[in-house]
Amino acid sequence: MLGTALRRCAVAAASRAGPRGLQHPAPVPGPTAAIQSIRCYSHGSHETDEEFDARWVTYFNKPDIDAWELRKGMNTLVGYDLVPEPKIIDAALRACRRLNDFASAVRILEVVKDKAGPHKEIYPYVIQELRPTLNELGISTPEELGLDKV
């Protein structure tokens, strides 16, 4: 398997060489070549949407989550090119409540609105789905706080 990966990387390197080929003999692969070849060769499994959602719900449902982990998780989640599902946001809001972090809860809702971008129907749908949770936890939306007018 490692030999196959080394050959693939060598073929890729040779194809990137100029039209006259390599100007000097190719070096013999050393111990670092194995590390590089493994990085060139990736065949990981793809995560389904359900697995993705379950992973993030589990992350935010950790009973011992702290404020730093909450912010780190939200920063990572915001980095993806998607609007999180309401069940993920629900878990994140409940984590905020466990931490008594009202500001982070409101910020999460602001981020969801920002991630929805020009698709004006997404944010109202998310708020509609989260309304029971927001009422239960006593969390106001940015619009209810007047933050959308600032």
Curated annotation (Swiss-Prot):
The modification N6-acetyllysine is found at K87, K113. GO terms for biological process: mitochondrial electron transport, cytochrome c to oxygen. Pathway: Energy metabolism; oxidative phosphorylation. Pfam families: COX5A. In response to mitochondrial stress, the precursor protein is ubiquitinated by the SIFI complex in the cytoplasm before mitochondrial import, leading to its degradation. Within the SIFI complex, UBR4 initiates ubiquitin chain that are further elongated or branched by KCMF1. InterPro entries: Cyt_c_oxidase_su5A/6, Cyt_c_oxidase_su5A/6_sf. The keyword RNA-binding does not apply. It is a peripheral membrane protein. Keywords: Acetylation, Heme, Iron, Membrane, Metal-binding, Mitochondrion, Mitochondrion inner membrane, Phosphoprotein, Transit peptide, Ubl conjugation. The modification Phosphothreonine is found at T141. This is Cytochrome c oxidase subunit 5A, mitochondrial. Residues 1-41 form a transit peptide. Component of the cytochrome c oxidase (complex IV, CIV), a multisubunit enzyme composed of 14 subunits. The complex is composed of a catalytic core of 3 subunits MT-CO1, MT-CO2 and MT-CO3, encoded in the mitochondrial DNA, and 11 supernumerary subunits COX4I, COX5A, COX5B, COX6A, COX6B, COX6C, COX7A, COX7B, COX7C, COX8 and NDUFA4, which are encoded in the nuclear genome. GO terms for cellular component: mitochondrial inner membrane; respiratory chain complex IV. A motif (SIFI-degron) lies at residues 2-17. It comes from Nycticebus coucang. The keyword Phosphoprotein applies. Component of the cytochrome c oxidase, the last enzyme in the mitochondrial electron transport chain which drives oxidative phosphorylation. The respiratory chain contains 3 multisubunit complexes succinate dehydrogenase (complex II, CII), ubiquinol-cytochrome c oxidoreductase (cytochrome b-c1 complex, complex III, CIII) and cytochrome c oxidase (complex IV, CIV), that cooperate to transfer electrons derived from NADH and succinate to molecular oxygen, creating an electrochemical gradient over the inner membrane that drives transmembrane transport and the ATP synthase. Belongs to the cytochrome c oxidase subunit 5A family.
